Amino acid sequence: MDLINSLLNFVVPPASLLMLAFTWPTLFFITTCEWLYNTYLNSENMENKVVLITGASSGIGEQIAYQYAKRGANLVLVARREHRLRGISENARRLGAPNVLIMAADVVKEEECRRFINETINYYGRVDHLVNTVSLGHTFYFEEASDSSVFPILMDINFWGNVYPTYVALPYLRESNGRIIVNASVENWLPLPRMSLYSAAKSALINFYETLRFEVKNEVGITVATHGWIGTEMTRGKFMVEEGAEMQWKEEREVHVTGGPVEEFAKQIVSGACRGDPYVKYPSWYDIFFLYRVFAPKVLDWTFRFLLTNGGARRTSFIGTGRPLLETSSPRRSAVMEGSSPRRLPPGPLTFSPAFQQQKSE
């Protein structure tokens, strides 16, 4: 057996690469034809369908809501910051959404997920797309974290905050032959410093949905969206740091990476979901790093060591401070995140994000 495995280890990788090189043009042609057909002839009509979006109070979730609104979908917007949802719901109505429900809820609690799913069914009678966008990152070296109580919070938000809504909504998605859209990240396989726990949670998330894809077969579609470095709250300060506080991001990473527009990523996600794409990748050129990780891991290791180290002492450079991420009396009780403690605020003035103003003028 050892001899056979040794032989296969030597023969299979180069033979597979050679076969892939010969079949790639044909596969690319087939994929392109499918994309054209699904884009122009078979794209799902979202008019009057029901789309539930978690983490809809900012960033990717907000922009996805606007994209579905332009397609005439009925929306259910879920987040902890209800005051933000009010303005976003008005923006969505102006962009074409016939009806918009907003609900304050914590997606890491199964009972609250059950509540907003049931309220959606009671009001609309169905749910067609479930869009999970909740996410929370961090910017610390794992060994330098001063409080390990933040570790479960990262897993709660990035993993269970997606799993619980999916678990509750799945029977209704089967009835409507609906779709689940997942906000993941290339960091599930691309090693970046200061993001170890976030990357681990995203890896668990993608493996969960890849397995679920086979379990639900063709009854429920699943679109996994992976993004590189884009301009969201996570790149503008919405991070968990060593001291357990929300702080403005300035220079946590050792290398500057240009962020792509979140509006474009949201547009690609919705278009891909309506086409029935299993994956949406933005930007797609990140895929090349995956090939290097599988077939030439040393090259990837050398590249990142060169790009992501500064040769000096580790540093964390912040400007400003925010509300406490963890309360002293209960270290896991709250986090400044998409899903912070349910604090009802009085109605404020209607807010319109700059991105909405730009979309409205187009």
From Swiss-Prot:
Its EC number is 1.1.1.146, 1.1.1.62. Substrate binds at residue 185. It is an enzyme of class 1 (oxidoreductase). PROSITE patterns: ADH_SHORT. It is a single-pass type II membrane protein. Residues 321-362 are annotated as: Disordered. GO terms for molecular function: 11-beta-hydroxysteroid dehydrogenase (NADP+) activity; 17-beta-hydroxysteroid dehydrogenase (NADP+) activity; estradiol 17-beta-dehydrogenase [NAD(P)+] activity. It catalyses: an 11beta-hydroxysteroid + NADP(+) = an 11-oxosteroid + NADPH + H(+); corticosterone + NADP(+) = 11-dehydrocorticosterone + NADPH + H(+); 17beta-estradiol + NADP(+) = estrone + NADPH + H(+). Expressed in seeds (at protein level). Not expressed in stem, leaf or root (at protein level). One of its GO terms (cellular component) is cytosol. Pfam families: adh_short (PF00106). A motif (Proline-knob) lies at residues 13-26. Belongs to the short-chain dehydrogenases/reductases (SDR) family. The proline-knob motif may be involved in the targeting to oil bodies. This is 11-beta-hydroxysteroid dehydrogenase B.
